[in-house]
């Protein structure tokens, strides 16, 4: 879980910007979207294979 303490004389917008950056860096939202719905093992394998094929292409 990402935590951000608001510093002295720091605006709320700046603290929110730092929080969003830390959440993005940790990959929290990406993980949440991935786990939002159950993914069958066959679909997971297919997605992984597609990603590998895409990486190999370039």
Swiss-Prot record:
Keyword Ribosomal protein found: yes
GO cellular component: ribonucleoprotein complex; ribosome
Feature: compositional bias, Basic and acidic residues: 31-42
Cystine bridges: none
Biological process per Gene Ontology, one example term: translation
Biased composition, class Basic residues, residue ranges: 43-58
Keywords: Ribonucleoprotein, Ribosomal protein
Pfam families: Ribosomal_S21
Similarity comment text for this entry: Belongs to the bacterial ribosomal protein bS21 family.
Name of the protein in its database record: Small ribosomal subunit protein bS21
Protein's gene: rpsU
């Amino acid at each position: 879980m990402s935590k951000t303490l608001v510093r002295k004389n720091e605006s709320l917008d700046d603290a929110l910007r730092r929080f969003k950056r830390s959440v993005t860096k940790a990959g929290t939202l990406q993980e949440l979207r991935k786990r939002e719905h159950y993914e069958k093992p066959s679909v997971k394998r297919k997605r992984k294979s597609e990603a590998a094929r895409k990486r190999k292409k370039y």
